[in-house]
């Protein structure tokens, strides 16, 4: 069996004729999961690849910060996107999930790795900043300003290569 991840922001796909009057919401016809659903879906825009990119960006930010986009700390216009954007690049360690940093520090604390600790720590920090910047670029408000799929793949591949080279 092969697992596939797709259309994360489109958990529900509702057409107007599928919504009965007993089950109406104020966001009639809104498709997706709150927090991952791009803003344009709230005003009736069609489902698009750009919407999937938005959802992917939010998911990426969630994975690396450990914060859900629906966290109580996010109110009104302050959201996960803005939380991370405000911190970069100088305060990346203040928004990164500490569990990620602790896992890496445990690996680097072994005797064979101590001589390269500073270099590896710098590479790790650069990679984390790059990944969060990708998440920010994917989750911008306006669809035309979001990264394209090919650019996301290229940049993530570049980060992966840099991270793996830094481990040697």
What are these regions (language model features)?
Residues 1, 5-168:
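Cytosolic eukaryotic protein kinase-like domains
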